[in-house]
Regions:
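Charged, low-complexity intrinsically disordered tails
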Residues: 163-168
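GHKL (Bergerat-fold) ATPase N-terminal catalytic module, capturing the glycine-rich phosphate-binding loop
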Residues: 1-161
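Phosphate/anion-contacting hairpin/loop surfaces
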Residues: 171
Length: 177
């Protein structure tokens, strides 16, 4: 079902980069409402078939990750973050589905900026519609040192949309919009 939705909502796999960038920028906008001096960055790295997109945005609590990432159509881009919906690039909370066009799973590590002691949480979703959410323990190597979110995709074997030159071109294209 998730795979079917992701393939029918988007014009093609290339939009996954746009959606990752858009989510990162929106998260930074939300964090800047709490902390105008917060760092503002979105980085994408590729190692083999693994793509990581890291932002310095507001991050998610365990409850937010379970509710927002696991419900098609859910979105944090609502007034509860203190921002009018029109302040965000993405509106519908379905952008993450585009990642399933290049990967069978999505792993999200996130640490909320709403509390100084927020733990890093991990959310893992799969194309068959299953997911898990849990906080990471203090010694876990995936703990984020600062608030924000890291999305990790393990691309399908031979997936052309993970090629570093292709990703760089897509970032350049979508960053100019």
């Amino acid at each position: 079902m998730v795979d079917l939705l992701s393939r029918n909502l988007y014009s093609g796999p290339r939009v996954y980069i746009r959606e990752l960038l858009q989510n990162g920028l929106d998260a930074i906008e939300a964090r800047s409402a709490l902390d105008p001096d917060c760092p503002r960055r979105v980085t994408i790295t590729i190692e083999g078939r693994t793509l990581k997109c890291r932002d310095s945005g507001i991050g998610l609590t365990e409850e937010e990750a379970a509710g927002l990432l696991s419900t098609i159509g859910a979105s944090s881009k609502r007034d509860e973050l203190g921002m009018a919906r029109s302040d965000f690039l993405g509106q519908f909370g379905i952008g993450m589905l585009s990642c399933f066009m290049i990967s069978d799973s999505i792993t999200v590590y996130s640490r909320s900026a709403k509390s100084a002691n927020s733990p890093t949480v991990i959310w893992q979703g799969k194309t068959e519609g299953t997911y898990t959410t849990q906080p990471l323990g203090p010694g876990d190597p995936h703990n984020l040192g600062e608030p924000g979110t890291e999305v990790v995709l393990e691309a399908h074997p031979g997936e052309p949309w993970i090629d570093p030159d292709t990703v760089r071109a897509l970032v350049d294209e979508f960053a100019s919009l």
